[in-house]
Curated annotation (Swiss-Prot):
Residues annotated as domain Flavodoxin-like: 259-399
SMART domains: Lactamase_B
The keyword Repeat belongs to this UniProt entry's keyword annotation: no
UniProt-annotated binding residues for Fe cation 1: 83, 85, 151, 170
Gene name per UniProt: fprA
pH and activity: Optimum pH is near 7.5.
Lineage: Archaea, Methanobacteriati, Methanobacteriota, Methanomada group, Methanobacteria
GO MF terms, alphabetically ordered: electron transfer activity; FMN binding; metal ion binding; oxidoreductase activity
Protein name: Coenzyme F420H(2) oxidase
């Protein structure tokens, strides 16, 4: 097949893959994504940084060959593997077959992971690197920075010193698929919305590590050298401080005066309560978002929770437990550990027909997920006017607590 590489700097090319059709990736909904790979061409050698998802070798290789032709080079001399996960290593075996003399540069932890995924690479030459190690391509110098648990134990960044390009793998990424490659080539609100969703669903539990790594980058004197950030998904950041500042804000719990109301319902009673709570919150002048789990996707909901000062979570009781869709969200929130950014206020609510129990379980699980549950509203069957007034007041009080 034919596919064009995209020049992003002198001797540096995007050679990734466009996945137009992807709609769900380990529970995360999206409208396609990219698997970004980059070819760095020096006077004495060529390095390929990361690769792509299994089954996409032909597209990736077509772009690599196009870039090689543009610079008058014949082969890839070095393979850089910033991260083991298959959306960035999925064609590594084919690359090794095509360029058998090219050593694979990665962290020591990554070697173990790659061999577990791809046993046929046992005969490949691996070069393990640590923070500060360099690879000289002749006029192009790659410096490696270990970033364990950002977001896997094997992860690392690669910095192209001369151009100030940070190849950050998953960090600073977005799940977007479009012909444009640079941040400034698409509307900013689309870019930042995708970056926020990516952070909320993938980086939130790592927030303290994000801040720690930023401090390390500053101490090493690398921050002022970064002129561009090239992640492994989505757009390339030509204004790197925009996303660095956004990550700092998200990691430190900078939130809006917003209440996000999330619920599911069987016969409409919990919906009535949700709407009353939303009205109460709005009466305090804060922003309000309302999601029904029967209709809305959890990865979109989590994106709004990231910038919300409080949430209200509602479910009817079924078999003495919360409605299943709400239980699913609770387990997801417990894993995301939002309290590592900020302990957000919360209230729980719902209707029941027997002994109840859903609100108590939700309160307990939200506390485990790092939320401060300030209120609990439960009604028998259909809420009365007085009970809806109580929901309104609960929403108003919740909003008042987060007003600055």
């Amino acid at each position: 097949m034919k596919a064009a590489a995209k020049r992003i700097s002198d001797g540096v090319y995007w050679t990734g893959v466009l996945d137009w059709d992807l709609r769900n990736y380990h529970g995360y909904t999206l409208q396609g994504t990219t698997y970004n790979a980059y070819l760095v061409c020096g006077d004495e050698g060529v390095a390929l940084i990361d690769n792509s998802y299994p089954g996409t070798f032909d597209e990736l290789m077509a772009r690599v060959e196009d870039a090689l032709q543009q610079v008058g080079m014949e082969r890839v001399d070095y393979i850089i593997q910033n991260h083991v996960e298959k959306d960035h290593s999925g064609v590594l075996v084919e690359l090794h077959r095509r360029f058998p003399e090219a050593p694979i540069y990665c962290t020591e932890v990554a070697v173990k992971g790659l061999l577990k995924h791809y046993p046929s690479l046992r005969e490949a030459e691996f070069m393990t690197v640590k923070t500060g190690d360099v690879l000289d391509l002749g006029g192009k110098t790659l410096t490696f920075l270990e970033t364990p648990l950002l977001h896997w134990p094997d992860s690392m960044f690669t910095l192209l010193d001369e151009d100030g390009i940070l190849f950050s793998n998953d960090a600073f990424g977005q799940h977007l698929c479009c012909p444009q490659r640079l941040d400034r080539e698409i509307p900013e609100y689309i870019l930042m919305d995708a970056a926020r969703k990516f952070y909320a669903n993938l980086i939130t539990p790592l927030s303290k590590l994000v801040l720690k790594k930023f401090d390390e980058v500053k101490e090493l004197g690398l921050l002022e050298r970064i002129q561009m950030i090239a992640p492994s998904h989505g757009q390339i950041w030509t204004d790197p401080m925009k996303i660095i500042e956004a990550y700092t804000g998200w990691a430190t719990g900078m939130v809006d005066e917003r209440v996000t109301v999330i619920y599911d319902t069987m016969h409409g009673s919990t919906r009535k309560m949700a709407h009353a709570i939303a009205e109460g919150a709005m009466s305090e002048g804060v922003d309000v978002r309302v999601y029904c789990l029967h209709e809305d996707d959890r990865s979109e909901i989590v994106k709004d929770i990231l910038e919300s000062g409080a949430i209200a979570l509602g479910a009817p009781t079924i078999y003495d437990e919360p409605y299943p869709s709400v239980g699913d969200l609770l387990m997801y929130l417990r894993g995301l550990k939002f309290n590592r950014t900020l302990t957000r206020k919360a209230l729980v609510f719902g209707s029941m027909g027997g002994n109840g129990g859903a609100t108590g379980t939700m309160k307990e699980l939200l506390a485990e997920a790092g939320f401060d549950v300030a209120c609990e509203e439960e009604v028998y069957y259909v809420p009365t006017g007085d009970e809806l007034d109580a929901c309104f007041e609960a929403g108003r009080k919740l909003a008042a607590e987060i007003r600055r």
